[in-house]
């Protein structure tokens, strides 16, 4: 009896705790390195990395296969992150767009990432848009999947249902961690609130019956013998609804991001409506929109299509950037411009060549792909052009 009361008191004490406030967190992440390119003679890996940010109650593991495909096709390292209160990242407040966007910017800074291509879905889409607006020099381009930079109070009822269904699984069923049928029982319990099997699968992907090695939560007792979500859902009933549907309009008033942005809209989704399109045009003048026949859950319903749109966009923008670099190099003539401009250009070229002179073996595995210099692409293109001229001659 004493043991039972002690255990109960420990569980109750932890459940009553509040999420700690932590301004800065180190997000858990996976790095997807591109395999050999389709052409064995072109072992090029861009130094403009991709960072993929998931949606509410998602995680870096949800789209690991998709992100590996993106890495392979674009020859680009892809970082997938776990936002705070998701996956293997820390459980902490605040949980608002300003804090989450700063988490992404801090992640890029901590890992030495520059000219980043951001990809964000749903909650992650808004986070990426805000990151671009607040850190334009850090971001090269972006792909925004089915969301708009506006307040969306109409989605709160769905967010409330998500939270309620997850808490119901924990409170009403009390499924033991060693129950061999725990996944089916959890799915059955969630049907009361979420009849759609695809959405249940998405939410239940966060459910675990044993804690990841070395992970601890300040508010969840993973060792109490029951199944748990990796998200502190009982402590997110407010922030996962009101804060997710919000948008910091006043904070970004007058701000724009001039880089290329591709929006992916689900034709059966209301997340990018007329008001959203108007806001998009105001914040992101250099944007385009692709439509995919899907609901808001595009990534689960049309994985091949959204991956194709992303890869085509990244490769197209890289080609345009390469052409611009080539024009700058070809038109460079020290005798025609001031000496100061010539010295500055030479310094930039030398810095790029220093990066490429570093051997792969001396670069840490987690960063070697993201530090490859863009001059490799320039040299390759020039060689190809010279070859074509010699053939035509």
UniProtKB/Swiss-Prot annotation:
Active-site annotation: 122, 146, 296
Residue stretch of the organelle transit peptide: 1-25
Biased composition (Basic and acidic residues): 343-354, 379-393
Residues of the AB hydrolase-1 domain: 49-151
Cellular compartments annotated: Mitochondrion
Skewed-composition ranges (Polar residues): 355-375
Region Disordered: start-end pairs: 343-393
Keywords recorded for this protein, A-Z: Hydrolase, Mitochondrion, Transferase, Transit peptide
Superkingdom of source: Eukaryota
GO MF terms held by the record: acetyl-CoA hydrolase activity; carboxylic ester hydrolase activity; transferase activity
GO annotations of cellular component type: mitochondrion
Leader sequence residues: none
Enzyme Commission numbers on file: 2.3.1.268, 3.1.2.1, 3.1.1.-
SUPFAM superfamilies in alphabetical order: alpha/beta-Hydrolases
Catalytic reaction equation(s): ethanol + acetyl-CoA = ethyl acetate + CoA; acetyl-CoA + H2O = acetate + CoA + H(+); ethyl acetate + H2O = ethanol + acetate + H(+)
InterPro entries assigned to the protein according to its UniProt record, in alphabetical order: AB_hydrolase_1, AB_hydrolase_fold
Family: Belongs to the AB hydrolase superfamily.
Function: Alcohol acetyltransferase that catalyzes the synthesis of ethyl acetate from ethanol and acetyl-CoA. Can also function as a thioesterase by hydrolyzing acetyl-CoA in the absence of ethanol, as well as esterase hydrolyzing ethyl acetate.
Name the record gives this protein: Ethanol acetyltransferase 1
């Amino acid at each position: 009896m004493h043991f039972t009361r002690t255990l109960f008191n420990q569980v109750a004490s932890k459940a009553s705790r509040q999420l700690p406030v932590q301004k800065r967190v180190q997000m858990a992440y996976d790095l997807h390195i591109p395999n050999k390119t389709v052409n064995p003679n072109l072992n090029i890996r861009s130094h403009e990395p991709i960072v993929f940010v998931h949606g509410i109650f998602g995680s870096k593991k949800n789209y690991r296969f998709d992100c590996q495909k993106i890495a392979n096709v674009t020859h680009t390292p892809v970082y997938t992150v776990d936002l705070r209160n998701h996956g293997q990242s820390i459980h902490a407040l605040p949980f608002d767009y300003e804090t989450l966007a700063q988490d992404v910017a801090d992640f890029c800074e901590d890992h030495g990432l520059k000219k980043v291509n951001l990809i964000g879905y749903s909650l992650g889409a808004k986070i990426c848009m805000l990151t671009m607006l607040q850190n334009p020099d850090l971001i090269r381009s972006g792909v925004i999947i089915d969301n708009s930079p506006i307040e969306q109070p109409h989605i709160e009822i769905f967010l409330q249902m998500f939270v309620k269904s997850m808490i119901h699984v924990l409170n009403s069923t009390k499924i033991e961690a060693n129950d061999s049928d725990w996944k089916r029982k959890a799915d059955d319990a969630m049907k009361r609130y979420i009849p759609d099997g695809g959405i249940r699968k998405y939410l239940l992907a966060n459910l675990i019956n044993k804690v990841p090695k070395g992970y601890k939560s300040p508010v969840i007792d993973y060792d109490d013998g029951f199944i748990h979500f990796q998200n502190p859902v009982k402590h997110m009933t407010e922030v996962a609804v009101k804060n997710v549907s919000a948008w910091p309009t006043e904070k970004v008033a007058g701000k724009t991001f001039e880089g290329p942005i591709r929006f992916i809209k689900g034709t059966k989704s209301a997340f990018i409506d007329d008001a959203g399109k108007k806001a998009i045009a105001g914040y992101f003048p250099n944007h385009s929109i692709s439509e995919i026949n899907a609901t808001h859950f595009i990534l689960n319903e049309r994985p091949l299509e959204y991956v194709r749109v992303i890869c085509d966009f990244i490769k197209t923008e890289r080609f345009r950037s390469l052409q611009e670099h080539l024009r700058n190099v070809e038109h460079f003539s020290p005798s025609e411009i001031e000496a100061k401009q010539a010295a500055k250009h030479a310094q930039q070229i030398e810095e790029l060549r220093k990066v490429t002179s570093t051997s792969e073996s001396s670069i840490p595995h987690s960063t070697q792909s993201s530090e490859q210099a863009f001059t490799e692409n320039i040299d390759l293109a020039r060689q190809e052009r010279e070859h074509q001229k010699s053939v035509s001659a």
